[in-house]
Amino acid sequence: MKILLHILSFVSLFLWQLPQCIVALLMMPFLGKLTLLSYENYCFLFKGTKMSGGISLGCFAFVSPSASKSNPTKAHEQEGHVKQSQRLGWLYLIVIGIPGITWAALYKKLGYKNYYCFYTEKWANKLAGLETYIRNGNYYLKFID
């Protein structure tokens, strides 16, 4: 019964997040060799050999080869952006995905040093229990003590 309930929950969430799940499935062949790191909160977390940073789309999150299971980047993606997607459903790409990828492409050109100051990233960090800190002029994530 527990397994059936889990499967029904996963299918419901997959359909609720269908647009971003489709984008994730279409992206997979371009992310290099994928290694499954974990499955938590109805989300598959993969390490991709051609990834730098991370991206979350529906039931799938992808991180760089340097990420580990306890890495803040993993938490940012799997516990932050995934929760956003689960809450927003079909609105996720409009509210988080498109603005977030645009921000990632432009923030340095716009003169910002802190990638995590944008609303999409701040909210993901809050959901994941993370905060930013500065070291040698660069911004990093850490778990809130």
Q: Where on the chain are the PLM-derived regions?
A:
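Short amphipathic alpha-helical segments and their helix-coil junctions
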Residues: M1-L5, E77-G80
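Short pre-active-site segment immediately N-terminal to the catalytic Zn-binding motif
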Residues: K50-G54, A61-H76, Q86
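Metalloprotease/metallohydrolase-associated module, dominated by Zn2+-dependent proteases
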Residues: K2-L36, E40, T49-K50, Y92-D145
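Beta-strand-connecting loop/turn residues
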Residues: Y42, C59-F60
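Catalytic Zn2+-binding segment of zinc metalloproteases
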Residues: E79-I96
